[in-house]
Structures are given as C-alpha cells and as structure tokens.
C-alpha cells in the first residue's frame, strides 16, 4: 500500500514523522504520540494512545517506525477523510470558533506542531486556500484544500 505513494508524499510524511519522533530515535512511542496530540488540542487517554500505536505496529514492539507510519498514512489517504474528520480538523485550527481560520490561528497550530514558518509561508498557505480572497479560510475552502491533497 505504501508503494502507491509519490516521492513527494513520502518526503512530507518523513517530515511529519520527525515532528512526532521528538527524541529522533526513529520510532514514535505512546508518550510522543500523546505530546503531539495534546499540542493539537486533543486529550487522548493512555489506552487510546496504546490502541492507536497497536493499530499500525506491525512488528508488535510497542512503537511505530517509519515504514509502519507510511502504511498508516497510505491507509488513511485511501479512506479519504470523512466529512466528520475534516470538520474536527477545522475546529482544531479555528481556535476562536468564529468559522474562519486566520493567519494567526494557522501560525499558532503550525508552531505547536514544531513547524516554524515565516510570516510569508503562513500568508502563502492562506492565499493558496483562500478562494474568496477575504484573507482567511472558511470551512468550504478548508474542505476543498483537504480534498485536493
């Protein structure tokens, strides 16, 4: 399944993997997974974290290595995000709940994920997704952006 990914996708997933793999040892532990999820405003229990790891932990060693992570991402891409998942993601970005993602909200989330973006990069992301040109991303624009990935 992971062999259906483009080089660009694999590079993107490698970057995402490094954000999770805080100590850089090549594996994601439940602790590291929890840290990232909490930085995104989620509050998973230890049991939920263990379940998430076990779901993709092919060799059963209790951690996720990069090949296992790729398989998980490929699987997720295949059952392309349900409307519900996209709405949840939108709510994570839309901190003040006003129905729009502002440049400041986008910058805040990306920084929490460990992605240090310049103001230009954040503005560029907004511009790419901002179909009606109002300087922020509404839900419809967010859905289009998520579906086009």
Swiss-Prot record:
Homology family? Belongs to the calmodulin family.
What's this protein's name?
A: Calmodulin
Q: Provide the residue positions that the database annotates as binding Ca(2+) 3.
A: 94, 96, 98, 105
> What function is annotated for this protein?
Calmodulin mediates the control of a large number of enzymes, ion channels and other proteins by Ca(2+). Among the enzymes to be stimulated by the calmodulin-Ca(2+) complex are a number of protein kinases and phosphatases.
Q: Which gene encodes it?
A: cam
Is Transport given among the entry's keywords?
no
By its UniProt entry, which Pfam families does this protein fall under? EF-hand_7
Domain EF-hand, by residue range, is 8-43, 44-79, 81-116, 117-149
PROSITE patterns according to UniProt: EF_HAND_1, EF_HAND_2
**Residues that bear N6,N6,N6-trimethyllysine:** 116
Task: Summarize where Ca(2+) 1 binds, as residue positions.
Answer: 21, 23, 25, 27, 32
Q: Which Gene3D superfamilies does the annotation name?
A: EF-hand
The UniProt annotation places Ca(2+) 2 binding at 57, 59, 61, 63, 68
Q: What else is known?
A: This protein has four functional calcium-binding sites.
Listed GO MF terms: calcium ion binding
N-acetylalanine: modified positions: 2
- One Gene Ontology term, aspect cellular component: myosin II complex
Locate the residues binding Ca(2+) 4: 130, 132, 134, 136, 141
* UniProt KW keywords: Acetylation, Calcium, Metal-binding, Methylation, Repeat
* Top-level division of the source organism's lineage: Eukaryota
